[in-house]
Amino acid sequence: MAVVTLAEMMEAGAHFGHQTRRWNPKMSRYIYCARNGVHIIDLVQTAVCMNNAYKWTRSAARSGKRFLFVGTKKQASEVVALEAARCGASYVNQRWLGGMLTNWTTMKARIDRLKDLERMESSGAIAMRPKKEGAVLRRELERLQKYLGGLKNMRRLPDVVVLVDQRRESNAVLEARKLDIPLVSMLDTNCDPDLCEVPIPCNDDAVRSVQLILGRLADAINEGRHGSNDQRGGDSEG
């Protein structure tokens, strides 16, 4: 049985690529045709790739691999947080901060600081500080929650990065490749399939397309970990 059907992908608009002038020739094998100056993705190829991605991701989850979902564009931000939470993955959905992977020691210190501030807030310790000092601490807390909130349970580097927009998240791609962390990537027609281990050719701009693909990948992670793909709020990343 197919992980995702052609009808589902058509309905989600997963077949719409970018304008032909913006294409990457390396994506040619995944392109069906050009229509009105826009490349149309071959959804038969997408279905095959999605089946492979599902099996690969499920196998990785079954062997205890930890996942990081990355997607900071407006269309992906909410979906990334929801689907990552559903399968117990960590996530970045606001802005990729330089060194999130390659400077992990420093990043972990910032995450620890976030946890400390959250404890202070919940215990009332911040409220007991002088007004000005309390305001400074709350601003720091809000900033750290915005950018690092999805990483609180990531105690070490991820084993797999799941990516929504390769071009936008180029720094994440560079850092993952530098550390030999495999990438499962949604690839629009302007992307480079050579920069990921598990390609999924599809529209990475439409909310429904992003939701469909990430939803299935979250299902694969839950199935690998729990033997079922309907888990909610799966295990936290260790």
Swiss-Prot record:
Cysteine disulfide links: none
Gene Ontology cellular component list: cytosolic small ribosomal subunit
One Pfam assignment: Ribosomal_S2
Superkingdom assignment: Bacteria
HAMAP family: Ribosomal_uS2_B
Stated family: Belongs to the universal ribosomal protein uS2 family.
Protein name: Small ribosomal subunit protein uS2
Organism the protein comes from: Synechococcus sp. (strain CC9605)
